[in-house]
Swiss-Prot record:
GO terms for molecular function: DNA binding. Residues 298-310 have a biased composition (Acidic residues). Involved in DNA non-homologous end joining (NHEJ); required for double-strand break repair and V(D)J recombination. Binds to DNA and to DNA ligase IV (lig4). The lig4-xrcc4 complex is responsible for the NHEJ ligation step, and xrcc4 enhances the joining activity of lig4. Binding of the lig4-xrcc4 complex to DNA ends is dependent on the assembly of the DNA-dependent protein kinase complex DNA-PK to these DNA ends. This is DNA repair protein xrcc4. It holds the Pfam family XRCC4. GO terms for cellular component: DNA ligase IV complex; DNA-dependent protein kinase-DNA ligase 4 complex; nucleus. Keywords: DNA damage, DNA recombination, DNA repair, DNA-binding, Nucleus. PANTHER family: DNA REPAIR PROTEIN XRCC4. Residues 233-324, 368-402 are annotated as: Disordered. InterPro entries: DNA_repair_prot_XRCC4, XRCC4-like_C, XRCC4-like_N_sf, XRCC4_N, XRCC4_N_sf.
Length: 454
């Protein structure tokens, strides 16, 4: 395959002195693995035939393939690299060796091509092509002009074919424009038809939407009215309930307190029980019994949180009714035992009875069972076991704690203001478990008989 190329080189370093300098024209005839080069300065012509063997043995560097090097060499000769980043060029004198004698021909030159492999690492490949000056310049120039004429003819033929292609393409373009116009007209017509149909459908849809909206709005209005009426009813009911509650609260405030009615006998009952147990509370020299009674009283005070002693405080004045004095000499003359206590007392056998007499008037011995610590004995909370309370009467009136009756000149009773020895008369219910008796008959006894039995 033969291929020819012509290129122009300028600003080449010339150290030979055989050229005119300035512009150089380079023509190459390319074969498969070789080429023929012609260089002229428009005055002289230099030529050389570069064979494959010369390229393989002399020009190609070691470690590079032949094809890679040949492609780089061809690229450097087809067009000058003005930037000098890939290729650089230089012309120098050629020194020929003949029969071990160096014959310097001043008319021959050497065309040097520098291939730059790495600009930063400064790796270059230098290739020198010797050129011999031709004696017949006319034949060489004839070859140049023949090539130029052939090149012009080939280019003209290519131009004609390209113009024909351009005309055909232009005609196709014009036809496509006409078709596009027709398509645009048809598109506009179809769009107008579709818009007309769509408007009709849209109007029908709007009518249906209006028809469906009207009942929905009516239903919403009805729902709002119903909800408002329900809210009003609820408000009225709430107001009525509040009024009823206020009326009930007022009635409760006006009605007498039930708590006072229930607590009064309870307080009196507990005070009576505590006074009943603490009859011998004046004596400070009891052996064992005083400690038991005091422990029981302490337990009762802790359970009731001192409420009974703070709430109920008996008062004694001239208007106070006569009080029950269980330690006096005359029982039946002036005092009576309450009716609910005035029963026949039938003592039952007791477990143990211990009586200790000291300098005090009376000693009561109580057998204490293990119970929780309480301040006073209550009939409801006391353990179910038999007790025997022994009270002895002593006629020794020298004891200041013993209550005694005193009368005026008119014969009226003077009340004793010694609160510790006075017990107010309060109604007391019969407690069979406390006194250990059987209520099996209706026979009433007096206070003296009851005390004698005790």
């Amino acid at each position: 395959m033969n291929e020819s190329s012509v290129s122009r080189f300028e600003n080449i370093t010339d150290d030979s002195g055989n050229t005119n300098g300035g512009f150089y024209y380079l023509k190459c005839n390319w074969q498969y693995n070789s080429f023929t080069i012609y260089l002229t300065d428009l005055t002289n012509v230099w030529s050389s035939n570069v064979t494959t063997k010369y390229i393989e043995n002399i020009l190609k560097p070691q470690g590079m393939s032949f094809d890679q090097y040949f492609q780089l060499l061809k690229k450097s000769l087809l067009k000058q690299d003005q930037t000098k980043r890939e290729f650089d060029y230089k012309i120098d004198k050629y020194k020929r060796k003949n029969n071990n004698n160096i014959n310097n021909n001043n008319e021959d030159i050497e065309f040097i091509i520098i291939i730059i492999l790495s600009e930063f690492d400064n790796i270059n490949v230098k290739s020198s092509i010797p050129l011999i000056k031709l004696s017949n310049h006319f034949t060489t120039f004839q070859h140049y002009f023949d090539w130029l004429f052939d090149k012009y003819q080939s280019l003209s033929l290519q131009n004609q074919t390209l113009t024909l292609q351009t005309q055909s393409l232009q005609s196709q373009f014009n036809q496509s424009l006409e078709q596009n116009k027709l398509f645009q007209l048809e598109k506009d017509r179809i769009e107008s038809n579709l818009i007309e149909k769509f408007i009709i459908i849209l109007n029908e849809k709007k009518k249906k939407i209006k028809e469906y909206k009207q009942p929905i709005n009516n239903l919403l209005l009805e729902q709002k009215s119903i909800s408002s009426s329900l809210s009003n009813c609820k408000c009225n009911n709430n107001n009525n309930n509040n009024n009823n509650k206020s009326i009930v609260n007022n009635n409760k405030n006006k009605s007498p307190s039930k708590q006072q009615v229930y607590t009064t006998p309870k307080k009196k009952k507990r005070n009576y029980q505590s006074n009943l147990i603490n009859i011998d509370n004046d004596d400070d020299d009891d052996l064992g019994n005083n400690d038991n009674v005091n422990n029981i009283n302490d337990e009762n005070d802790n359970d009731n949180d001192n409420d009974n002693e703070e709430d109920y405080k008996p008062t004694f004045n001239n208007s106070t009714p006569p009080l029950l004095d269980l330690l006096s000499n005359d029982y039946d003359s002036y005092y009576n035992v309450p009716t609910n206590v005035r029963k026949k007392f039938k003592p039952t056998p007791t477990l143990t009875t211990t009586t200790t007499t000291t300098t005090t008037t009376t000693t009561a011995s109580i057998i204490k069972t293990p119970t929780k610590k309480r301040n006073s004995i209550s009939p409801q909370k006391s353990p179910h076991h038999h007790r025997n309370i022994n009270i002895k009467k002593n006629n020794n009136n020298n004891n200041p704690s013993s209550p005694m009756k005193k009368y005026n000149a008119n014969g009226t009773l003077i009340p004793n203001n010694n609160i510790n020895s006075l017990i107010p008369i309060t109604p007391m219910k019969s407690k069979s478990k406390l006194f250990n008796f059987n209520d099996d008959d209706n026979h009433d006894i007096g206070a003296s008989e009851l005390l004698n039995d005790l």
